[in-house]
Each structure stands twice: as structure tokens, then as C-alpha cells.
Amino acid sequence: MNLLIMGLPGAGKGTQAAKIVETFELIHISTGDMFRAAMANQTEMGVLAKSYIDKGDLVPDEVTNGIVKERLAQADIKEKGFLLDGYPRTIEQAHALDETLKALGLTLDGVINIEVDPASLIDRLSGRIINKKTGETFHKIFNPPVGDYKEEDFYQREDDKPETVKRRLDVNIAQGEPIIKHYRQAGIVRDIDGNKDISEVFADIKKVIENLK
């Protein structure tokens, strides 16, 4: 079983990916882990990626695609199957993944697409506040500070401000839509309502994956 998980930042993709991997005993392939392993093992693509990172440059698509190909070519992939997380990020990377899978004799069985209302994601992602004195982190909705606090006792990181979060989501939506469309045309997308609580979302995902078998 070879799967891809997609969802906007804050949609709970990381939490659900961990549950999928544990339940179905798949290999979790996340972009960050792949890069770290390739660089640590000094693979051809890992050495190349490090040369860009050390200079502070963006790693080009062909190097990222090469790192993915190196990982998918390893023996454990055919034995166990995989869950791709964080790749592809662009439609060009999706086309490159198609070519890689074809070259390796692998198929993508399903794309788990966690859908969450962007407005609620902005609330989720922009709710983080930090106590100016203690540095403690709270969330306006999910973990509000208890006690005699005033609003001016807290500050918000630039990254967490609603307008910044909205811009980030807009970029993710613009990049993600063509990828979802590409996989819809292949008939392998399974939409999951991510507005429910974590256990309900996973129950829906589990059902979908079991039906793919």
C-alpha cells in the first residue's frame, strides 16, 4: 500500500500521518527526514543538497526529486509500502513523482486529502500567544492562560499573526490545488473532513485505507 497525505498547515496532517504509519505499518517518508538521512549518509543527492543548504540557497526541484527517488528505490519500500508526507509540493514535483514511481515499478494507491475550512485554520494557527515575562506559550482558544493576566502581558510572533497565517495558507492553497486536481483525474483522491476531532478523523481515514486494499 503506497499512500500520499495532503492537507493545509494546521489541518492535523502530522498527527494523522503518525497514526496511519503505526496502524498500517507503512514507512513514513517526510521531506525533512529524507533530506537529513541523505545528507547524513552522504548519498549523491544528499551531498548536492547540502552544498545548496550550506550556501543558504533553495534546493532545486531536481535535487529534491532525486532524493525522493533514492529513498523510494530502497528495498524496504517494496516490502512494506509507504506514506509520503510533505512531497510533492508543486505540480512539477507531482509529475516528477509519477515518473519516479513508473521507473521503479511502484504505484500510488491513494491520496488522503484532509480538508479543513481555511477560516478555522486561521483561528487555529493564529491563536498562539507568548507571555512576555515567562516565555510560556498559550493558545487563545485551546489553551488560554489562567489567572490575573492582561492582554498586554502577551505578545504574538510575526509568523502567528492572522494576516501572516492567511498569506501562508493562500500560498499553500495555490500550490496544492493543481496537485489535487492531477490526482483526482487519476481517481485516487479520498477527501477526509478534518473539521472533526482527531479520533473521528482517523476513523474516517482508516475506513478509506481499508477500502483501498
Curated annotation (Swiss-Prot):
- Gene3D superfamilies recorded: P-loop containing nucleotide triphosphate hydrolases
Give the region (LID) as residue ranges: 127-160
Q: What CDD domains is this protein classified in?
A: ADK
Q: Which GO terms describe its molecular function?
A: adenylate kinase activity; ATP binding
UniProt KW keywords = ATP-binding, Cytoplasm, Kinase, Nucleotide biosynthesis, Nucleotide-binding, Transferase
Instruction: Please name the pathway.
Output: Purine metabolism; AMP biosynthesis via salvage pathway; AMP from ADP: step 1/1
Report residue spans for region: NMP.
Answer: 30-59
**HAMAP family in UniProt:** Adenylate_kinase_Adk
Protein name per Swiss-Prot or TrEMBL: Adenylate kinase
From what organism does this protein derive? Streptococcus equi subsp. equi (strain 4047)
Q: Its encoding gene is what?
A: adk
